[in-house]
Amino acid sequence: MEQVLKRKVIRNSQHGFTKGKSCLTNLIVFYDEITDSVDMGKAVDVIYLDFSKAFDMVSHSILASKLKTYGLDEGNIRWIESWLDLRAQWVVINGSMSSWQLVSSRVPQGLVLGPVLFNIFIKDLEDGVDCTLSKFADDTKLGGEVDTLEGRDRIQRDLDKLEDWAKRNLMRFNKDKCRVLHLGWKSLMHHYRLGTEWLGSSSAEKDLAVTVDEKLDMSQPCALVAKKANNVLGCLSRSIASRSRDVIVPLYSTLVRPHLEYCVQFWAPHYKKDVEKLERLQQRATKMIRGLEHVIYEERLGNWDCLVCGRQE
């Protein structure tokens, strides 16, 4: 497998389960290009694509064929085929259990090898695609400028190519969950189809758990993050009896602060009101520590990092 990876089979557009890449790199790289176009006054359409049970639909025979094409030796291919094919499953419906059946598709997600095999399987998804395509495992999005008829046709041609790839590789798009986000004030709100079905438009979409809206305004994700973190902080306040610093600080750092910092380099608030909304969470958390209830915030911080200061740096 290492020899395959050394040949750079997994493309730069794939950020999932890839060394040195993450949800953050996926968002920053994709939207950096998209926002450049919007800043120049261009209209841009982004199509969010959703595969139906992506990992479960990977055909073992097609995967083996691709591994051979990408240069993996026969011995390793046979080992992988044995690892995948010697799996069986049964189902229960209304209390009746089926017989055991060998599984001819699916790569396991709980092991390191499974996601790597999926990345290899989906590598050629973008062959022939002209617009910007970005992947995080099976989460896929396609974007391009649509000021001109040619730009809109280019996106439609790419969608046709992606649908054709899915059919050839025995995969399916969940078209009810595929959405179009129109960006830029010149947007014509063009309609696209995937196969024979027209895709719905949306004013905001969750992309890798970060909300992106048609105005590229980060106040909404900021508010959602603050609400989620506030809920966790409220649960801690109600359920934790101890109010010692040694208890509150680790719990806050482990359960609350990650919500505030997940991909924050991408959605970092630009408005003072949004920054202060996040900082109030930490102010509330420091008040939970016994003996600090009436101490001013700057002194309560102690060795805690100030969220506002961290973002200003």
Region locations from a protein language model:
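Catalytic palm subdomain of template-directed nucleic-acid polymerases
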Residues: 53-70, 131, 140-167, 269
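Mobile genetic element proteins and their domesticated derivatives, centered on retroelements
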Residues: 1-4, 30, 50, 67, ...
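Catalytic palm active-site di-aspartate
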Residues: 14-18, 44-54, 80, 106-114, ...
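Active-site palm subdomain of RNA-directed nucleic acid polymerases
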Residues: 1-14, 115-144, 243
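Short, conserved micro-motifs composed of acidic
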Residues: 95, 157, 172-206
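Short linear motifs embedded in intrinsically disordered, charge-biased segments
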Residues: 272-313
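Basic, alpha-helical interaction scaffolds
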Residues: 199-266
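Conserved pre-catalytic core of RNA-dependent polymerases
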Residues: 1-108, 144, 305
